[in-house]
Amino acid sequence: MRGSLFAVVAFALSLGGGAAAAQPVPAGEPAPVVMAQGYTLASTVMDQPRRLNVWLPPSYAEGNARYPVLYVLDGGEGQDFHHISGLAQLATISGTMQDLIVVGVESRDRRNELTARTEDPRHVQAWPTHGQSDRFRRHLAEEVIPFVEGRFRTSGETAVMGESLAALFVVETFLRKPALFDRYIAISPSLWWDYQRLAKEAPALLAKHDAAPRTLWLSIADEGGTMQAGIDKLRAALTSGAPVGLKWSYRARPGENHATTYHPAALDALRELYGLPPYWDEKAPLPWWLSDEAPASAAPAK
């Protein structure tokens, strides 16, 4: 554990469970409802403090079990951390998914952190700070993941999730550094970037993969254009040249657009990758309280 790399400051976020107990306050006074803890890391890779948000399932405090970790890109308080960790929290209530640790990795300059460098003048003019995805990937590999694994009881099983540019980063990481995570969830990835260069390079990059077991979960909204063209190229590369150990799937979401697809698609992804069997036998007869038939003794008196 690279403890010397980090100056870690814990701060409470708003909403939820799995953190320190709330302090009593006078009646009628507002009190924060704590759902997670935040940490500030003094990153040497990014050369600035970086924020992580961590949600722990309630069972974390009840024993010594170890948990898989889901890393959520764009995982700041005002980004996607709350609604994705909320899916994990709901699953603990309903018992529908495996308990997870959810780590939100905040982004500051998305074009800088989530895209690869291009020399195309139109991209350079429109987004002059772009192109540092390699550095951000080093931040995850050398700082974020070691911090999480050193501080929390993790099982060693990891997943990364993102949407739009964050999903582009997920796909790039899967193709270029596949051993960094076990599971990759990319929702409406912006594969239009740099004229679909990453999708066009996919066949050659896949050919370099080993046979280790990994999962790639892809989804796209009803977007068309170069968004759809890019993911179609990636799908073609996977169909013809997926590594032996890879399980991959694709889910089109024709009823959604780029602004609405993330939350429902994320729920589908988590259900497929971490779902638990229902607590009842779906093939068994319905229990009596769900039956339409009422016994004669239950009929109202006349």
Where are these regions (language model features)?
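Bacterial N-terminal signal peptides
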Residues: 7-16
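Sec/Tat signal peptide C-region and signal peptidase I cleavage site
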Residues: 18-21
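Non-catalytic cap/lid and distal C-terminal segments of serine-dependent acyl enzymes
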Residues: 23-302
